[in-house]
Regions:
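Domain-scale recognition of functional cores that engage charged ligands
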Residues: 1-135
């Protein structure tokens, strides 16, 4: 086949990619300022919430609901075979043109990058990457 290298994710990466980690974090540190309520059983009541699949990618199979359960926004995808998780909604930063931003911090032994994904209410695979440089 002529391959010189094969790159595999280590098994623990599956844990870090699973949104089930969000529920575990919530269950072990309920009401922490930096965490959102999360549940496997049912949607959160009387508050805006998001339904996601455990192993979805780039906004696929994500839906946002208002406080009474009306769907506000949704994205189809190929991950419906996975279990769903419900999480409190957190409003992303928004610019004057109505675009939303999701921050990302990158580490390689130390903080080395800051970037934002810019897109719609559900950040998906059509989102732009907006890099930043900090001196």
């Amino acid at each position: 086949l002529g391959r010189k290298a094969v790159v595999l994710n280590p098994p623990y990466s599956v844990l870090l990619q699973s949104k089930g980690l969000l529920k575990y974090a919530w269950d072990t540190h309920k009401y922490h300022d930096l965490l959102l309520a999360a549940s496997f059983e049912e949607p959160l009541r009387y508050e805006k919430y998001v339904k996601k699949v455990l192993f979805g990618r780039e906004g696929a199979n994500v839906s946002i609901f208002d406080e009474v359960g009306n769907q506000i926004s949704t994205r189809d995808g190929d991950y419906l075979r996975y279990r769903s998780i419900y999480q409190s909604f957190a409003q992303l930063a928004r610019d004057p043109e109505g675009r939303y931003y999701q921050a990302g911090v990158f580490y390689a032994g130390e903080a080395c990058g800051l970037g934002f994904r810019r897109g719609g209410l559900i950040i998906d695979n059509g989102a732009s990457f907006v890099g930043h440089f900090v001196e």
